[in-house]
Curated annotation (Swiss-Prot):
Belongs to the radical SAM superfamily. Biotin synthase family. It is an enzyme of class 2 (transferase). It catalyses: (4R,5S)-dethiobiotin + (sulfur carrier)-SH + 2 reduced [2Fe-2S]-[ferredoxin] + 2 S-adenosyl-L-methionine = (sulfur carrier)-H + biotin + 2 5'-deoxyadenosine + 2 L-methionine + 2 oxidized [2Fe-2S]-[ferredoxin]. This is Biotin synthase. It comes from Mycolicibacterium smegmatis (strain ATCC 700084 / mc(2)155). [4Fe-4S] cluster binds at residues 89, 93, 96.
């Protein structure tokens, strides 16, 4: 008899969350646990948030904004990024047009030091406090590290801005060299939940990325780690990813949304619905109440202008301005005007040192 009733009533299929079954509302729980006490939602609670119906979205975003203001404050950190080495990467990240294994239109190219300095100057003019040097590699070789060192020295001589790097997986010796160069923050994304990672990358493991991040923290650099939503992961795996990040406890989490690139294995995937993307933004804020949560790639195609505004009023407290590595972003002026319209102050450089 129990089997019959179980088959007739599946709470998840009927859109009923465990919180509703237990007679508690997950947003009420989050208000007391996260907003009042600063304790992030666990994996099961985050899943309940992701399963909320669309009619609860505004309430969810409002609560996430309150949490962000309570535990992070009103300031928004602005960052620009530049690709030092583009394309020709030996890894097979299925979302990435920079892989040399796929028939994408992106070709390998290097940027010289004067171009790096000019990009840093233009980034600083927007009010950004962070400039991130990125390279499409499995990990840096000696040539790349020498170019990074020369670029950092030249930038420091001419631009008052903090420098971050994203150069793939590192050895312990490479981590220390970057720290000695004065790299403020290191980005290395886990990309997705541990259980879903083999569907995204097969040429290296999730654990290899995790090891790099731990070495970065031990060397005294800030850890920046996020990923891409909308690569075919389930809501359960999205909640798992938030829990993975909460365990890592990075200083910053960049949230990207898949922008399907021609020639890649994920090139034909559908763009994530805006409501799902916004629920994820709010859910990650409730799971990571004190973490810098940054709007990154794909938000233009996924959310548009209105969605970007809702995200900044729904838990986001950092943005990448200008273009991304291989795709166009919003004009920096548009993001800066949006922050001004929302009366969100840009974090000052001296407040982040």
């Amino acid at each position: 008899m129990f089997e019959v009733f179980r088959d007739l009533f599946n709470p998840q299929e009927d859109g009923v969350t465990q919180a509703a079954i237990n007679g508690t509302d997950v947003l009420d729980v989050a208000r007391e646990q996260v907003l009042e006490r600063g304790v992030g939602l666990d994996q099961a609670q985050t899943l309940q948030v992701l399963q909320l119906p669309d009619e609860r979205l505004d309430d969810l975003l409002s609560l996430a904004h309150e949490v962000r203001m309570r535990w992070c404050g009103p300031d928004v950190e602005v960052e620009g990024i530049i690709s030092l080495k583009t394309g020709g990467c030996p890894e097979d990240c299925h979302f990435c047009s920079q892989s040399g294994l796929f028939a994408s239109p992106v070709r390998s190219a290097w940027l010289d030091v004067p171009s790096l300095v000019e990009a840093a100057k233009q980034t600083a003019k927007t009010g950004a406090t962070e400039f991130c040097i990125v390279a499409a590699v499995r990990g840096p070789d000696e040539r790349l590290l020498a170019q990074v060192a020369a670029g950092i020295e030249a930038i420091r001589n001419e631009v008052d801005i903090q420098i971050a790097c994203s150069l793939g997986m590192l050895t312990e010796e490479q981590v220390q060299r970057l720290a000695d160069m004065g790299v403020h923050r290191y980005n290395h994304n886990l990309e997705t939940a541990r259980s879903f990672f083999p569907n995204v990358v097969t040429t290296h493991t999730w654990e290899e990325r995790w090891d790099t991040l731990n070495m970065v923290r031990e060397a005294g650099m800030e850890v920046c780690c996020g990923g891409i939503l909308g690569m075919g992961e389930t809501l359960e795996q999205r909640a798992e990813f938030a829990a993975n990040l909460a365990e890592l406890n990075p200083h910053e989490v960049p949230l990207n949304f898949l922008n399907p690139r021609p020639g890649t294995p994920f090139g034909d995937l559908e763009v994530l619905p805006a409501s799902e993307a916004l629920k994820a933004v709010a859910a990650f804020r409730l799971a990571l109440p004190r973490t810098m949560l940054r709007f990154a790639g794909g938000r233009e195609i996924t959310l548009g202008d209105l969605g970007a505004k809702k995200g900044i009023l729904g838990g986001i407290n950092a943005v990448i301005v200008g273009n991304y590595l291989t795709t166009l972003g919003r004009p920096a002026e548009a993001d800066l005007q949006l922050l001004d319209d929302l009366q969100m102050p840009i974090k000052a450089l001296n407040a982040t040192l």
